Amino acid sequence: MTCPKFSVALLHWEFIYVITAFDLAYPITPWKFKLSCMPPNTTYDFLLPAGISKNTSTLNGHDEAVVETELNSSGTYLSNLSSKTTFHCCFWSEEDKNCSVHADNIAGKAFVSAVNSLVFQQTGANWNIQCWMKEDLKLFICYMESLFKNPFKNYDLKVHLLYVLLEVLEGSPLLPQKGSFQSVQCNCSARECCECHVPVSAAKLNYTLLMYLKITSGGAVFHSPLMSVQPINVVKPDPPLGLHMEITDTGNLKISWSSPTLVPFQLQYQVKYSENSTTNMREADEIVSDTSLLVDSVLPGSSYEVQVRGKRLDGPGIWSDWSTPFTFTTQDVIYFPPKILTSVGSNISFHCIYKNENKIVSSKKIVWWMNLAEKIPQSQYDVVGDHVSKVTFPNMNATKPRGKFTYDAVYCCNEHECHHRYAELYVIDVNINISCETDGYLTKMTCRWSTNAIQSLVGSTLQLRYHRSSLYCSDVPSVHPISEPKDCQLQRDGFYECIFQPIFLLSGYTMWIRINHPLGSLDSPPTCVIPDSVVKPLPPSSVKAEITAKIGLLKISWEKPVFPENNLQFQIRYGLSGKEVQWKIYEVYDTKLKSTSLPVPDLCAVYAVQVRCKRLDGLGYWSNWSTPAYTVVTDVKVPIRGPEFWRIINEDATKKERNITLLWKPLMKNDSLCSVRSYVVKHHTSRHGTWSEDVGNHTKLTFLWTEQAHSVTVLAVNSIGASSANFNLTFSWPMSKVNIVQSLSAYPLNSSCVGLSWLLSPSDYNLMYFILEWKILNEDHEIKWLRIPSSVKKYYIHDHFIPIEKYQFSLYPIFMEGVGKPKIINSFTQDGEKHRNDAGLYVIVPIIISSSILLLGTLLMSHQRMKKLFWEDVPNPKNCSWAQGLNFQKPETFEHLFIKHTESVTFGPLLLEPETISEDISVDTSWKNKDEMVPPTTVSLLLTTPDLEKSSICISDQRSSAHFSEAESMEITREDENRRQPSIKYATLLSSPKSGETEQEQELVSSLVSRCFSSSNSLPKESFSNSSWEIETQAFFILSDQHPNMTSPHLSFSEGLDELMKFEGNFPKEHNDERSVYYLGVTSIKKRESDVFLTDESRVRCPFPAHCLFADIKILQESCSHLVENNFNLGTSGQKTFVSYMPQFQTCSTQTQKIMENKMYDLTV
C-alpha cells in the first residue's frame, strides 16, 4: 500500500520518551502542511537519524524554545544526556516558506518564525499532514506520512488521535477540560503511513476541533503540538460527474459536467484540456464557476481530452481529485446542432463545417439537401463565416414517419459530393386540445387531453403544466416561466385525466402540455380556463310526466339544481317508451318555468321524458340527462265513438221468434281514450220506448225481436263517461224487403285477396253504408263482416281464402230506416272460376315472354355467328356446312375428299339453304354501241366439253328462270337486276386429259357455245378477238367488271337441258396428278378493301390492295389442256388469277396452284 502524500512525520527513537510542551494550538490550513521537530543548538553524543545535522542553530535573536524530553534508563544509544531534552518544532505550509515555531520560553507563549528550511534537513524529523472533511459531511480524515526514514529498528508503532469539539464563542479562549479529549486509533501501514477518522455530526460542522497526535514506539511516547480546525472549512468534494462534450449551435465545443449533489455550498471548477488537430495543438487550464466551459475555434477532425476538479467557491476548502479523463473527437463534417426537435410552424436553422481531404471547404461551395432527394433552394442559405454555412427552414410541417425513421435527414454537401453524416430534424405537431369541466358541486375541475393527434418519439414524456393567476385569464394565454406539474392518469379511452381539487372558481388556470425529450422540450399552445365558466350542472331533479285529463297534453315538471346559481336553460326530450326511443327535443329558455305541456299524437301510450340544463349565457356544458320519467296510461277523455257492430238473426220456426245477436269489435285505445270499462246497448222501440243494457266487457248481446222496428245503439263507457258518437242500427220488417243490389260478383285474385263488385238500382231511401259478410259454406264457421262506405262500388277483401272451399258472400244495404235485403252469392262468379283457373298465367306468361325474347336474341346472334363462320372465315373447312358429319380425325376422309377423284362428283345444293344457287343465266353487255368490242359481264363456266353438235342450249330474251338444283358439274353465276350489290356464288374447275374426252362431250360443248351466243342478245363472236374456241379446251371462265348503271339481259336455258343432264354420273375418270383445293371468299367491295386473305403455304394474313379490285381473271392451264391460251380481254388493263370459291374438285397442277397462291384474288362483280 502506497501512503498518500498527506501525512504526519513522526520521529522515532528507541527507548526515548519525548514530551513536547505547548501552550497554543496550530490552526490547520485547507492545504497540506509539514510538522518539523528540531533539536536545540546543543550537540549530543547519540546517533541521530540520517539527514539531521548536529550543528547548532540560532533562533534569529529570539529566546530558545525549550522542549523537555524524558529518557528511560534502558536506553543504550544515548550518552551524557540529561533527564530532559529540548526540541524546537515548526509548522511549515505549502503556501509559506517561513516556519512557525512553537516554544515554551520564559517570557511566556510565543510563535518563533523566520526559521530557515535548511534546519529541517540538518537535524530533527519531518511529517506531512493533511486533514479534510468528506463530502458527506460525516467524517473528518487526517493522513500522515513520515518524510524522515528511521535507520533504527522499527518497533510496534501505534498512533492515536486525541480530539475534542468545542463551540467557539467570541472573546472566550479555548480551554478544554481535563479528561475531555477523546481518542481514536489510526490505521498505520508498514511504511509509516497512517489514516485517522474522526466522526463529526452535521450540527457541529462549525465547531472548533482541537487535536494532537500521540505516537508510541518501543516504549517511547511522543505528543505532537496541539492543532485546531473547523470542519466546515476543510471540506473536500468528490470529483465532478457526467463529463460531456458537444458542438453548440454556434460551432463552439461545450464542455459540461454535473456537480456533486451533497455539497452544501457552491463550487468553483478547474478545467484542463488539450486539443490535437492536423493544424493546431494547444493546452489550457481555466477556472470557472459554472458547470460548463465553451471552447472556441473548433475544427473538424480534432481530438480533445478534458479533466475537471472542484472546490468551495466562497470560502476555504480543498480541491477534489481530478475526474476521469474524457476524450472527444470531432467528425469531418460538423453539424451544429446535430439534432433539432421543434414544433409545427416554427423556423429552425442548421450550421455546417465541411472538411474534405484535410482541407476545410469554403462555405460558399456548400449546398444542402433534404433526405438526399430534395435540394434546398439557395435562397435559404446564409454564409456565417469563411467555413460555416447556415440553412434555414421556415414554417416547418410535421415530419412524416418513413418506416422506422421518424425524422428528416439534412445533408451538408461539398457541391456535388455528400458525406454520409447528416443532421436529424424532428418536427412534431404539438396542437393538443385540453378540455376541462367543473362538477355540479363546484368542488373540483377535471381536465382531459389526448395524444392521438401527435407523433410519439422514443424517449419522450408528456406532462401537463399549469399556472394559476389570481383572477380571470389574460387576453392572450402564454407559457408562464413559473409553472407547476400536474399528475395525469391514462384512461381506457386513450385520454389523460387530471383533477384539480380544491379550485378557485374565478382564477385563471393557464395550461399546456410539455413534451420532454433528450433533444429538448416542446410546449403545446397554452389554453386558459376559468372553473366558473366550464361548469357542468347537476341534472334537474324531481322530473315528472303525465297526460292531463280532459285536456290531453303531456305535462312535464322538474326542479332546478342547487348549483350553479346562474340562470339556466332547460332541454326536454320525450318519446314513446320502448327499446329504441325516437326522441323529440323541446327547449325552455324561461328560467322561472318549472313545468311545461306538450301536445302528443297518442294520448294512450307510455312516454319517456328526460330533462337537462345549462347556463343561459351559453358558458359551460349541458348537464347529464335526468333519470327518465314515464307517463301512466289513464282515461283522459270520453271515448271518441262507440264500436261498430253487426247482427246475426236466428229464427225459430216452431216458436215463431227471431233472436238477434249483436256483434262488435273491442275499441282501440285511440278511440276509447284510453280504456273501456263496459259497453252499454241502448234499445228503442215504439211500444216499449228506450232502455239500456250494460253488458260489461262482452262483445255480443242477444235479444228478442218482436216489434216492427227495433233500433239499437252500442256505447263505450270509460272512467270519464260514455262515448258521444255512436253507430245506430234499425231492424225493420218492411225495410228487410227493400232490394237495391242488382248484382254481386266475387273474383279471387289470390289466396289472400278477393275482389267484389256490385251494381245498385235507384232507391228513394237514404243509404248510409254497406255491410259485407262472408263465410265458408256448409260449415259452422265464424261470420266475418266489414262496414263499407255507400259510395264504393268495388272492394277488396284481405283474408286467408282456401281455394278448394266455397264461400258465401252477402252484401247488406244499410238505410236510415233499417237494414235492406241482402244480395247473396254462394260461389265465385263464372268469370271468377276462369280467373281462378288461369291465375297461374300471371306468373307463367311473363316467364314465357322473357324466355322467348332471350331465345330470339340467341338465335339472331347465332345466325350472325354462323354466317360469319361459313362465309367470312373460309378457308377453314370445319366452319363449312359441307363438312358437317365428316370425321376429320380419319386420314381416309382427307384422302377421299382432296387427293384422288377419278369419278365426277354430282352437283349438289348450296351450302346455305336460304340462299339461291342460280335462278337464271344473265349476260350484261358493257358496251355502249355495236362498234365497241366489250367483253361480256357474266358467262357460265362449263366444267366439261361435251359434243356441241348433239345438243344445244340457247340463250333467249325470255325473263324466265332455269333452276339447276340437280345440275351436274356446272355452276352458273347470276346477278340479280334488282340488287345493286353484286353477289357471287361458287364455281368449280375440273380438267381431264385430252385423251379421255368422248366425242359426245365435245359435241355438247360446241352446241352450247354456238347456240347460246347466237341469240339477239348474245355476245358477238367478234368480241373475243384474241380468243380461240377450241374443242380440246376443257374449261373456260369469262368474268369482267360490270358498270353499276348497266343492266344484264337474262339468259334462259330453255333447250338442250336434257342432253346435258344425260351425262350425270358418266364423266370419265381422271388420271392426272393430285389436285389441290382452292377457296374463294365472297364479300362486298367496301369490305374487301380493308379485308385480308390467308395464303396456303405461308399461312400469313395479308391485306387485299385496292388496286387489285375489278381486275381481269386469267385461268392458267399448264397441264390441264389449256382452256385459255390467251388472256380474255375483259375491258381492263389489269389481270387476275382465278381460284375457285368452294372446295369442289379441280385438277389444276401443283405449279398452277403455287402461281395462283402468290396473286391477289378478287371475284366481286
Curated annotation (Swiss-Prot):
GO CC terms of this entry: basolateral plasma membrane; external side of plasma membrane; receptor complex
Region of interest (Required for JAK2 activation), ranges: 892-897
Glycan attachment sites: 41, 55, 72, 80, 98, 187, 206, 276, 347, 397, 433, 624, 659, 670, 697, 728, 750
GO MF annotations in UniProt: cytokine binding; cytokine receptor activity; leptin receptor activity
Family matches, as PANTHER family: CYTOKINE RECEPTOR (PTHR23037), LEPTIN RECEPTOR (PTHR23037:SF44)
GO annotation (BP), single: bone growth
Organism of provenance: Sus scrofa (Pig)
Phosphotyrosine: modified positions: 986, 1079, 1141
Cytoplasmic side: 862-1165
Gene: LEPR
Assigned protein family: Belongs to the type I cytokine receptor family. Type 2 subfamily.
Subunit (UniProt): Present as a mixture of monomers and dimers. The phosphorylated receptor binds a number of SH2 domain-containing proteins such as JAK2, STAT3, PTPN11, and SOCS3. Interaction with SOCS3 inhibits JAK/STAT signaling and MAPK cascade.
Protein name: Leptin receptor
TM region positions: 839-861
Tissue: Kidney, liver, spleen, lung, brain, testis, uterus, ovary, corpus luteum, theca and granulosa cells.
Domain (Fibronectin type-III) ranges: 239-332, 539-634, 642-736, 740-834
PROSITE patterns recorded: FN3, HEMATOPO_REC_L_F2
Disulfide bonds: 37-90, 89-99, 131-142, 186-196, 188-193, 352-412, 413-418, 436-447, 473-528, 488-498
Modified residues (Phosphoserine): 881
Function according to Swiss-Prot or TrEMBL: Receptor for hormone LEP/leptin. On ligand binding, mediates LEP central and peripheral effects through the activation of different signaling pathways such as JAK2/STAT3 and MAPK cascade/FOS. In the hypothalamus, LEP acts as an appetite-regulating factor that induces a decrease in food intake and an increase in energy consumption by inducing anorexinogenic factors and suppressing orexigenic neuropeptides, also regulates bone mass and secretion of hypothalamo-pituitary-adrenal hormones.
